[in-house]
Structures are given as C-alpha cells and as structure tokens.
A protein has these predicted regions:
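Sec/Tat signal peptide C-region and signal peptidase I cleavage site
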Residues: 17-21
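Hydrophobic small-molecule pocket/channel-lining residues, especially in calycin-type beta-barrels
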Residues: 22-199
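Bacterial N-terminal signal peptides
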Residues: 4-16
C-alpha cells in the first residue's frame, strides 16, 4: 500500500512538469522552444572552403612574399535543441600544415536577445567567451581571449556579404582593452562546399 502511495505521489509531481515541457515552458517560465532568432547563425551551417588572410609580420620577407595566404575549412551543424550552432574551424598554411583548430558552441540567449559563444582553441587549450548580435544583415561578435603569444586581447568581428553560397568574416583585435585596434587581423572568405557537413 505504501509503495502504491509513493508511486502516485511521484506521478503527481512529475506529470505536470512533463506536460508543461511539451507546451514550450516549464517551471518558473522556462522556455524550451527556441525562438525565431535562434536561426540567425543558420547561414554558417554546412561545410565551407576558406581563403584566410592575416597581416604579414613585416620585414624583408613580407615585402618579398606579401601577405600570407592561408586556407581552411569551416563546418557547422544546427544543434542544442534548435537554440544554436556547433562549429569547427581549421586553418592551415600554404603547405597544409595545421595552424589553428577551434570548436565553438553558439547559443541564442532569449533573455538577452543575443548570442553567447564559447570557443575552444584546441591546440593551445584556451577558451574564449563571446557575445553576438544580428544587425542589418550582418552578425556582429565580440570576445575576449588570449593569442598564440599569450597576450590578452579583445576582438570584434563581423560576418557579412552573406549568401547561400558564401560569406566573409573580418576580425579586428585590440591588445589595449579596445583603445586601439588592428583592423583585419583575420579576414576569411568562405565558399560553400556542402549544405550538410560530415562529423
């Protein structure tokens, strides 16, 4: 008899919570259905071939060879129950040697009406936190992190010229908390290879 009573009590406590989850909100107004804005990063979904440009370090080699031209791939998948995108960015030098591998989770924050991202620099074991917002057909992102030499930086980036077959990305960096900026610290031109990226 006591077992039956415990089961009935457990069912009474669990069923209302499960029922509200099916209708998009749960206890305390928790929203479980992603809003329309959670699709703003959908342009990134798929597989991309990249042309990457970074400023040359200067000196004689830079005058002779010019700005280094790098290549890469960017793969992205919808995820997080419709709330965001998971992506992987790989950059290699002209000989195919790996230079950078990052893995990012981008989730729409319905309360802040913007994006929150966490990016892991795999080779350097560094994590960068950022935010983003969709404005005038561009995705604008800001972040704080540590560069390959261990210097703290602030970055501002934008995804622009977004079409079904391509997009461009530019990241500017500041090493002094945003007082001065190196514009175009990274420039990427992406061309779609596939609508769905393999894992």
């Amino acid at each position: 008899m006591i077992t039956r009573w415990i089961l009935a009590l457990a069912a009474a406590l669990v069923v209302p919570e499960a029922a509200t989850a099916q209708h998009g909100s749960g206890p305390g107004g928790l929203t479980t259905v992603a809003p329309r804005e959670a699709s703003q990063f959908d342009f990134l979904v798929g597989q991309w071939e990249l042309t990457v440009r970074v400023p040359s370090p200067g000196g004689l080699a830079a005058r002779i060879h010019g700005t280094p031209r790098l290549a890469g791939t960017w793969k992205a998948w919808r995820g997080l129950d419709g709330w965001g995108v998971e992506d992987e960015l790989r950059i290699v030098d002209g000989s195919g040697n790996p230079l950078s591998l990052t893995h990012a989770l981008r989730v729409f924050d319905a309360t802040a009406r913007g994006w929150t991202s966490t990016t892991l620099d795999i080779y350097r074991a560094r994590v960068t936190q950022g935010t983003g917002a969709w404005r005038d057909g561009q995705m604008l992102v800001t972040a704080q992190g540590t560069d390959a030499e261990g210097h703290a930086y602030v970055s501002r980036g934008r995804y622009y010229d977004i079409t079904p077959d391509g997009f461009k990305f530019q990241q500017d960096r500041s090493l002094d908390g945003g007082r001065t900026w190196t514009e175009g610290a990274v420039r990427i031109e992406a061309k779609r290879v596939a609508a769905v990226a393999p894992r």
